């Protein structure tokens, strides 16, 4: 199945349309594939962002993606804190912050040892707002609210340098929730490392590993909540729900969610 792009009177999300045109497609046999695994198009609207937060709350998804990570943070953050802190106050930069819950444990533990300043970073303004609201309620230190909160990895180096000052010399970067798995790992890690100061900054990377069978992993993703979240990308291209079909597979050493387009579609700008 493939997209056909023509002009008519249908209204679509032009950002998604242009991004798909810019990226182009790859071929698998006679099938054209548009890769949007990097998540740039996942949270463009409030509806998309909230649909993801709803998915996070699902029991199976939360257990697989977040519960174990939070348990590990609770167990090891005291030891990590002792290794990380170098005497200065610390900026906690939360990359792909979501609603901020992944940063709660690090903030609570670090704030007992030094002065902390929290800076959420996400491509979704809705996520940033939710993270600022959640972390502000902890009352554990300053929460940075400025234009660079809404950023991708291209701006990370600017953010880290803007936050560094005489009091807050050190940046502690959080990259949790297996967010790194949504990107080409070498490219994204290059951007992260470039934003760090050697000998001063630290990165805490969270990646989900599992010894479950592929069939078990697939089952936890093949849900209505997953479909409700990811289908919003195609619905903004004026597809109807019955014109697309979600599939889940285990390939390239990871779970992949994809959509088959059941018929050609005309698009307009």
Predicted regions and their residues:
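A short, conserved alpha-helix within the catalytic core of class I
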Residues: 181-194
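Hydrophobic pocket-lining residues within nucleotide cofactor-binding pockets
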Residues: 153
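SAM-dependent methyltransferase
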Residues: 210-269
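Short catalytic/ligand-binding loop motif for oxyanion handling, primarily in non-cytosolic enzymes
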Residues: 101-103, 127, 181-183, 211-215
């Amino acid at each position: 199945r493939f997209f056909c792009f023509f002009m008519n009177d249908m209204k679509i999300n032009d950002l998604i349309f242009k991004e798909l045109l810019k990226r182009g497609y790859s071929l698998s046999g006679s099938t054209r594939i548009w890769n949007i695994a990097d998540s740039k198009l996942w949270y463009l609207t409030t509806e998309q962002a909230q649909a993801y937060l709803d998915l996070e709350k699902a029991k199976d998804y939360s257990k697989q993606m977040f519960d174990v990570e939070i348990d590990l943070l609770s167990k090891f953050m005291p030891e990590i804190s002792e290794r990380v802190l170098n005497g200065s106050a610390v900026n906690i930069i939360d990359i792909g912050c979501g609603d901020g819950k992944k940063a709660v444990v690090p903030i609570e533990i670090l704030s007992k040892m030094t002065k902390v300043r929290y800076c959420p970073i996400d491509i979704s303004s809705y996520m940033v707002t939710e993270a600022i609201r959640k972390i502000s309620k902890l009352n554990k230190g300053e929460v940075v609210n400025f234009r660079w909160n809404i950023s991708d990895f291209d701006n990370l180096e600017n953010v880290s340098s803007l936050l560094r000052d005489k009091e807050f010399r050190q940046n502690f970067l959080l990259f949790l929730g297996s967010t790194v798995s949504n990107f080409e790992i070498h490219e994204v890690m290059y951007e992260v490392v470039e934003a760090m100061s050697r000998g001063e900054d630290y990165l805490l990377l969270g990646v989900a590993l599992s010894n479950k069978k592929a069939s078990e992993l697939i089952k936890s993703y093949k849900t209505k909540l997953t479909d409700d979240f990811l289908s919003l990308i195609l619905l903004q291209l004026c597809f109807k729900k019955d014109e697309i079909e979600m599939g889940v597979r285990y390939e390239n050493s990871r779970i992949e969610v994809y959509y088959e387009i059941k018929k050609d579609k005309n698009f307009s700008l």
